[in-house]
């Protein structure tokens, strides 16, 4: 807030003040930015990519949107690596400050309509973001996005999804609490990839993270080791209790599409089990704009407890 004592001090004493997004933009101009944008999946995918790179010979810096369980922090610093992994946030058009070397776009389901107003404006913002990727860089798009990219000359564009695209999975094996699959990639196939956090939604997240790792020169064995040793992110499909009687997890699924994917992943993992959820809507405007979609997604559950809306930055409407 503008009246914050420390902020007021720096303003009064003539210090240059920049938003976090501006600082991240400076980092992407000084280093090779590996950025993950999209309505959902950003935090897990960028955290996966950061872990794969950090434990490899390539290494990386990283500025993430959640606390990674491998490191207990949302940032990683490396004095030797020229790569920086960044979670590219579309809220307030923050990702327009970035100049990525390579970027994944996970999804473009409309969100933040309090900022954008319309679905068309939201998609146009992502289109502009793709134009910021530097020449000679890379764009990895999820299959089936409505948004059409506008990349500069010399940018290589790939597609990905669980079962289709330039990067995809084959020979998926789910059982006994583990998930294995083969990565099919234009940069070299990798067999028997193991998910460190074995939920099916992480197959796609992992494919995107491995694409960035391959683009950055991480070896196949380093990629497999990083995927298997990734421990997840706080509040992203985060198991808090798991025994013979019950499983309890917390997940920051605050968009209807995210809720749907989370429920599908849980049902695939625990077939035939009852699923009950406590759901706290996030933001008045998001709840207003997508109440029908929320109702449809929550209907996939067996039992739902609704709490009051969490306002975050908003006042009641």
PLM feature spans:
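Glycine- and acidic-residue-enriched helix-capping/strand-helix junction motifs
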Residues: 312-317
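Beta-strand->loop->alpha-helix junctions that form or flank phosphate-binding loops
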Residues: 18-25, 63-65, 143, 154-175, ...
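Short beta-strand segments
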Residues: 84, 167, 189-193
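A polyampholytic, Gly/Pro-enriched intrinsically disordered region
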Residues: 36-46, 172-183, 193
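Short internal beta-strands
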Residues: 138-143, 276-279, 300-311
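Nucleotide phosphate-binding/pyrophosphate-handling subdomain across enzymes
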Residues: 175-177, 186-303
């Amino acid at each position: 807030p503008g009246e914050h004592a420390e902020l007021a001090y720096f303003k009064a004493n003539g210090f240059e003040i920049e938003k976090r997004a501006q600082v991240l933009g400076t980092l992407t101009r000084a280093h090779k930015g590996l950025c993950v944008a999209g309505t959902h999946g950003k935090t897990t995918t960028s955290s996966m990519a950061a872990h794969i790179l950090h434990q490899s010979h390539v290494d990386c810096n990283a500025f993430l949107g959640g606390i990674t369980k491998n490191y207990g922090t949302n940032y990683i610093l490396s004095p030797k690596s020229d790569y920086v992994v960044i979670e590219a946030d579309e809220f307030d058009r923050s990702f327009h400050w970035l100049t990525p070397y390579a970027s994944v776009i996970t999804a473009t389901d409309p969100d933040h309509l309090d900022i954008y107003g319309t679905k068309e404006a939201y998609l146009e913002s992502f289109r502009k973001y793709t134009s910021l990727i530097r020449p000679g860089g890379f764009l990895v798009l999820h299959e089936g996005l409505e948004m059409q990219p506008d990349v500069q000359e010399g940018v290589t564009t790939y597609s990905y999804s669980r079962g289709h695209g330039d990067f995809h999975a084959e020979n998926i094996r789910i059982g006994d609490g583990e998930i294995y699959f083969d990565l099919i990639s234009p940069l070299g196939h990798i067999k028997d990839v193991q998910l460190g956090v074995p939920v099916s939604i992480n197959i796609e997240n992992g494919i995107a993270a491995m694409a960035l790792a391959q683009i950055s020169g991480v070896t196949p064995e380093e990629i497999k080791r990083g995927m298997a040793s990734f421990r997840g992110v706080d509040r992203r499909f985060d198991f808090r209790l798991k025994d013979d009687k019950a499983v309890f997890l917390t997940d920051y699924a605050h968009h209807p599409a995210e809720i749907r994917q989370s429920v599908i992943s849980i049902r695939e993992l625990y077939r035939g089990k009852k699923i009950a959820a406590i759901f706290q809507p996030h933001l008045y405007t998001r709840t207003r704009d997508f109440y029908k979609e929320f109702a449809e997604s929550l209907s996939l559950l067996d039992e739902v407890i609704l709490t009051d809306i969490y306002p975050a930055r908003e006042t009641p409407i």
